[in-house]
Structure formats: structure tokens, C-alpha cells
């Protein structure tokens, strides 16, 4: 959360710094080109009509088109700045800073009280839910008993088998279940 707030502050500071740099550079360009200009939200830009009329006699068509493109970009930037300002004004972080009991009091009173629905269980609904639970329990018990009857027991070995370790082979090779006799 602290990182998010810090990042937002850095972005705002950089945006203000860029706006100041742009406005100072555009004001200097306005003094070079004598023409009408507009100043809106501390951002300077020339209108397309004024720039086209003043530059038609002085500059080539390429320079005029570049200025028109720049003015359109400035308009787009202004629109983005306005949207950002609206968003920052609409989204207030005061709710994060208010105590919890004040937030709950404000949220409780939002709905009209006469239309409130009271969900209190009746005796009939309680008895039906108890019956359903008992049926489920009985079904589970029957299922468990059925499994115990139907699952066959694993057959036990008639003769116990001797475990063989293959890591330490014996001198005599023997089968674990067969009787071995030595012949010398």
C-alpha cells in the first residue's frame, strides 16, 4: 500500500514537472510566432485556425502540417489531463483514513428500513431441514455398512514368506518358498 501511494506521488510530481517544461517552451515559441494563442489549465497551445492563417504567408505547408499535428497532440494531452483530474477528484481516499465504525454507520443507512426483509426461520422450515439431515445421515450409514459387507477380505498367505534382500546376496542361492537341500 505504501509503495502504491509513493508511486502515485512520483507520477503526479513528474506530470507537474513536464507540464511546466512544456508550458515554458511553448510560451517561448509563442513569442517567436506572433499570433493568437489560448491558455487553458496552465498549458499553452495555438489554435489550428490561427496557426494556419499566420503561417500561410510565412512558412511552407510542411511546417504548417507539423504545427497542426502538434496542436492536435496538445489537445489530446489536455483531454487526458482533464480525465485524470476528474478521476482524482472523484476517487477520494478519505474512506481509507476514516475509522471503521464511521464507515459502517454510513453504509447501514443507505437502504430504506420499511422494505427490509426479515429472514427468521419458521418451525416448519426447521423440521423439514432436520428431516433432510437425518435422511442424509441414514443414507451414509447404509452406504458404509454396504461397503463393509461387499468388500472381500484380502487372502492371507498360507505360508509366511521370508523377505529376500538382494543387496546382500547369500552364498547359497535359495528360493524363499521352496525347501532347499544341499548335495555335497
Curated annotation (Swiss-Prot):
Membrane-spanning residues: none
PANTHER family: ALPHA-S2-CASEIN-LIKE A (PTHR16656:SF7), ALPHA-S2-CASEIN-LIKE B (PTHR16656)
Localisation per UniProt entry: Secreted
Biological role stated in the UniProt entry: Important role in the capacity of milk to transport calcium phosphate.
Renumbered residue ranges of the record's region Disordered: 49-68
Modified residues (Phosphoserine): 23-25, 37
Primary site of residence: secreted
GO cellular component terms, A-Z: extracellular region
Family: Belongs to the alpha-casein family.
Organism of origin: Mus musculus (Mouse)
Signal peptide interval: 1-15
Tissue specificity field: Mammary gland-specific. Secreted in milk.
Record's keyword terms, sorted: Milk protein, Phosphoprotein, Secreted, Signal
Entry protein name: Alpha-S2-casein-like A
